[in-house]
Amino acid sequence: MRRARRPLGPPFVRVLLLAVALGLGLWPLAADAGPWLRRPGNTYLQLSYSRIAAARIFSPDFSVQPLGASYEQHALGAYAEVGLIERWLTASFEGQLFRYNLLVDQGATYGLGDLRLGFWTGLVEKPVRLAAAVLLGIPSGDSSPSAGPGADAEGTLIARTLPTGDGEPDVELRLSLGHSFGRARRWPLEHYLVAEAGYWFRTRGRSRDLAGNLSFTDFSDAFTYRAELGTKLPFRFLDRFWFILRMTGVESFASSIDASRTCATGLGNGVTFNAYGFEVAARIWKGLGLSIGLDSAFRARCVAAGVNLKTGVSLEF
């Protein structure tokens, strides 16, 4: 962790509220296998960069409050999926290969973020697509970053509010419904529609207090959802682009009291958000693609009140 060059001052108390945004933040633009599973051997790879900057946070009562400092998160992410068994099994992987958290002029932490493995199976193929998934969260990030040898209590406290992971293994069960339509004489536009719902089983998060002792937090389960509409225009060159509107959300079952505790610990229990997003995905050449998108929460608690920018390059083969 890089230490500050100036004293924290009174606003630091409010900066502690940033912790949940650091532990989880606003989820990046959604990526998953969805209802269209891959054929055996068919592979999709994506490398992405995302950035969020904020000077405000959604507090435990859903109001927007100032942080008292500027926060930035930069992340290098990876997503992959590969078909294993026709219709019945597609595997996915996603995670942050490198995550950099910064409180401007105060300190920063960096390292590997949390990872997630997914296993998807097809349930229905016609007239709509329906798939089910099991998603396994791996706590590979650091839930208790160190300020380094010889750091004082204040430096250690800053480091603890800038985790790269939540220290908690978890499991999510998800259903994904999809349908593609259009490209007809009376309606030449091409569309796809996806609706997903999941139940997120949370477990116990592990971290360390300022004295270095192990501490544990029981996470409350959550309901997750995603709705997405993609549109492609029937014009030369423009038919290489998908224009995507998206709504995503997490509704934690934690009480506001529980959420207020974790807003000051960075472990992420109680995180709730409803966010809208827009993305443009382009096919450049054969299986090579590029994408850029934005998303932002309009209702949330314990999440940074800022816009998340994500760009990515993908390869399908």
Model-derived features with residue positions:
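Outer-membrane pore/translocation modules
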Residues: 99-222, 264-268
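Short loop/turn motifs that connect adjacent beta-strands in outer-membrane beta-barrel proteins
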Residues: 32-41, 85-89, 124-131, 182-191, ...
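Outer-membrane beta-barrel biogenesis signature
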Residues: 25-58
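Transmembrane beta-strands of outer-membrane beta-barrel pores
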Residues: 49-55, 84-88, 95-101, 136-142, ...
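Surface-exposed strand-loop-strand hairpins of Gram-negative outer-membrane beta-barrel proteins
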Residues: 52-75, 105, 161
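Transmembrane beta-strands of outer-membrane beta-barrel proteins
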Residues: 43-47, 89-93, 117, 130-134, ...
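Outer membrane beta-barrel transmembrane domains
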Residues: 54-60, 64-67, 208, 213-317
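Residues on the lipid-exposed face of transmembrane beta-strands in outer-membrane beta-barrel proteins
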Residues: 47, 78-82, 117-121, 134, ...
